[in-house]
């Protein structure tokens, strides 16, 4: 979580002047910090985060536990980067996926604490979704891998 907060502080430093010049769209400012469903539909946001993270957990287990990649961790790391890219491109439209609880929660805390110009609320009513859905989704993905291939 400290990495997510530190990274978000760098984003704030880079975009501060743009936040000052975005008076009519606090939602656009929040989108630089955290995820949220495009239609403000919590069920859709939960399902999207859950499925995307289940896929990530399943594939990560395959990359790091599969016979081919055990000897070549660097290839597995590249594979994870490509999987995350594909998940963001394919399933990221509805929510701008978190895929990780810290990716949403840390920056949302930064948004809530800092006196950012023209910001609105931090949408805490949605904040539980990227935490719970990603955790449960990853557990399901790992469980499906273990059932399918064992460890």
Spans of features found by a protein language model:
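Membrane-interface helix-loop junctions and terminal tails of multi-pass membrane proteins
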Residues: 1-151
């Amino acid at each position: 979580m400290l990495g997510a907060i530190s990274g978000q502080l760098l984003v704030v430093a880079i975009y501060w002047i743009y936040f000052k010049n975005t008076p009519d769209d606090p939602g656009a400012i929040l989108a630089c910090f955290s995820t949220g469903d495009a239609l403000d539909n919590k069920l859709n946001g939960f399902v999207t985060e859950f499925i995307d993270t289940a896929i990530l957990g399943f594939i990560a287990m395959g990359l790091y536990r599969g016979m081919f990649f055990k000897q070549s961790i660097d290839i597995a790391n590249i594979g994870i980067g490509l999987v995350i890219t594909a998940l963001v491109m394919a399933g990221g439209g509805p929510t701008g996926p978190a895929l990780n609880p810290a990716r949403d929660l840390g920056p949302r805390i930064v948004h809530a604490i800092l006196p950012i110009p023209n910001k609105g609320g931090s949408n805490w009513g949605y904040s539980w979704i990227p935490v719970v859905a990603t955790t449960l989704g990853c557990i399901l993905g790992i469980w499906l891998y273990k059932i399918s291939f064992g460890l």
